[in-house]
Amino acid sequence: MELILLFFFLMALLVSLSSSSSISDGVFESQTSVSGRNLRHAKKKCEVNFEYMDYKVLTKRCKGPAFPAKECCSAFKEFACPYVSQINDMNSDCAQTMFSYMNIYGNYPTGLFANECRERKDGLVCPLPPLYSHNLNASTADSTPRFISLLISAATAVFALLVLT
């Protein structure tokens, strides 16, 4: 009986921890890469429309010529973290598209965020996403998978309690 409880507890823990909560270091490759030939497979179109985003959180806090690292990185995380799962999807063009529009609206030097914004070896730490964010519309909501994960975790815990009683 204790083994069954341990199994369900571990499953619930694994499901709840499976969501990404950091911006991968790999996304910065699209910001630092120089134009040239690329033999990689075609990437799917990003489901987040970065073209019409409000870039003021970046452009008001991350200004040249100094581009203070603390302000720029903080603003970058505030802007990018709500879309962490889309940006980290290396099969989509989300990171490349986001950095393109950031550079258009902010006129940032190439590699600014890649070179200045380092927290861990695997990237920047994002706070866990809320279950619902007013910044996301229904087609880009990354809260739905998180909600499902939490629902599965809760159901597993309830099932484990029922088995024990």
Curated annotation (Swiss-Prot):
This is GPI-anchored protein LORELEI. It comes from Arabidopsis thaliana (Mouse-ear cress). It is found in: Cell membrane. Disruption phenotype: Failure of pollen tube arrest and fertilization. Deficient in pollen tube reception by the female gametophyte. InterPro entries: LORELEI-like. Expressed in leaves, buds, flowers and stems. Highest expression in the synergid cells of the female gametophyte. Glycans are attached at N137. Female gametophyte-specific component of the signaling pathway required for fertilization. Required for reception of the pollen tube by the female gametophyte. Acts specifically at the synergid cell surface for pollen tube reception. Plays a role in double fertilization and early seed development. Component of the FER-regulated Rho GTPase signaling complex. Acts as a chaperone and coreceptor for FER. Required for localization of FER to the plasma membrane. Residues 140-165 form a propeptide. Residues 82-93 are annotated as: Required for its function in pollen tube reception. A lipid is attached at S139 (GPI-anchor amidated serine). Interacts with FER. Keywords: Cell membrane, Fertilization, Glycoprotein, GPI-anchor, Lipoprotein, Membrane, Signal. One of its GO terms (cellular component) is side of membrane. Residues 1-20 form the signal peptide. GO terms for biological process: double fertilization forming a zygote and endosperm; pollen tube guidance; pollen tube reception; synergid death. It is a lipid-anchor; GPI-anchor.
